[in-house]
Amino acid sequence: MLLSPHEQERLLIHVAAGLARERRARGLRLNHPEATALLTSFLLEGARDGRSVADLMTAGRGVLTRDDVMEGVPEMLAEVQVEATFPDGTKLVTVHQPIA
């Protein structure tokens, strides 16, 4: 299988997000890379599903809570920016204060 660097990056994000989901399901608190991967994957998949940028910006704030992540992670993740592919092209999705 021959993947472009962009495709490799997307695949890595989804693998990391899958691991984060498993750890979260086991009751473990997520670290910074795991939380970032989970949020990024949520935004990429939402764009693929045809959700709007505005909808994803709002919904992205409800993916994780402070109880889901390790201490200090919410402060490190002031915002998450993802270039996502929507049905009508690629757009930048920014979620400010993603961890409520």
Curated annotation (Swiss-Prot):
It catalyses: urea + 2 H2O + H(+) = hydrogencarbonate + 2 NH4(+). The keyword rRNA-binding does not apply. GO terms for molecular function: nickel cation binding; urease activity. Transmembrane segments: none annotated. This is Urease subunit gamma. Its EC number is 3.5.1.5. Disulfide bonds: none annotated. It is found in: Cytoplasm. GO terms for cellular component: cytoplasm. Keywords: Cytoplasm, Hydrolase. Pathway: Nitrogen metabolism; urea degradation; CO(2) and NH(3) from urea (urease route): step 1/1.
